[in-house]
Amino acid sequence: MSLEQIIEQAFEKRAEYSPATMPQEVKDAVNSVLDQLDNGSLRVAEKKDGEWIVNQWAKKAVLLSFRLNDNYPMQTGEHVQFYDKVPTKFANWTEQQFVEAGVRVVPPAVARRGSFIAKGVVLMPSYTNIGAYVDEGAMIDTWATVGSCAQIGKNVHLSGGVGIGGVLEPLQANPTIIEDNCFIGARSEIVEGVIVEEGSVISMGVYIGQSTKIYDRETGEITYGRVPAGSVVVSGSLPSKDGSHSLYCAVIVKKVDAQTRSKTSINELLRLA
């Protein structure tokens, strides 16, 4: 059987498995998938012909991985230890591995095994969960979290305290995706498989899930689950039909192209909104 077939069949029986009862074939398959996710040769989601395709079987392998091991003590330095079942990505790395990978990891940043961190990425004190893919040149700023299986594009900036949702808790069908050259403002949350398309700017304190209304100020259109490429987005509200109250929404205040982005600072884009 192929790796995918082993994972698919095992996932149907996942409730039966524990570290003691999981067949060796399944353990080997799950570990193989985790290794490929860790080195970037496999992704939970990838863009093909302009559309994002989710490798659901890879996501299932991530879910199965939590039945591979019991919790065990993990020593970090002389006075700190953790108790978990998933090792950290950099636990046994040598200086040469860091040099070759071209990443910067600022203490106490944590990335779990099975996450991929590409060349030129800076991890400020932040958390990157299993199955996530962080592409070249991205900045994961202080106290930002990259959820399980989330996809972070090239040159993305996740500002301080940003939360990018994962697929594990609660269980989600599709990963959250932030495409290339996006800026996500401080304390914003993008969750539940929402896609923020290339070159978009999300202001500070914007919260977008699948049920969040995304209102385009220019067209009056309301959409869900996807921020169009080049959007500048701020938090706002829309009135109810009877005018008795207003409910939160995300507002697209303008669209910008790559040329405008290259000549204009993020603050200017938001101030001119």
Curated annotation (Swiss-Prot):
Q: Which UniProt keywords apply?
A: Acyltransferase, Amino-acid biosynthesis, Cytoplasm, Diaminopimelate biosynthesis, Lysine biosynthesis, Repeat, Transferase
> What molecular function does GO assign, one term?
nucleotidyltransferase activity
Q: List the subcellular locations.
A: Cytoplasm
Reaction equation(s) it catalyzes: (S)-2,3,4,5-tetrahydrodipicolinate + succinyl-CoA + H2O = (S)-2-succinylamino-6-oxoheptanedioate + CoA
Which Gene Ontology cellular component annotation is one that this UniProt entry carries?
cytoplasm
Residues that coordinate or bind substrate: R104, D141
Q: What is its EC number?
A: 2.3.1.117
**Pathway, per record:** Amino-acid biosynthesis; L-lysine biosynthesis via DAP pathway; LL-2,6-diaminopimelate from (S)-tetrahydrodipicolinate (succinylase route): step 1/3
Which principal EC class is assigned to this enzyme? transferase
Its subunit composition reads: Homotrimer.
Return the similarity comment.
Belongs to the transferase hexapeptide repeat family.
> What HAMAP family does this protein's entry cite?
DapD
- Kindly provide the name given to this protein in its UniProt entry: 2,3,4,5-tetrahydropyridine-2,6-dicarboxylate N-succinyltransferase
Originating organism: Psychrobacter sp. (strain PRwf-1)
Gene name as annotated? dapD
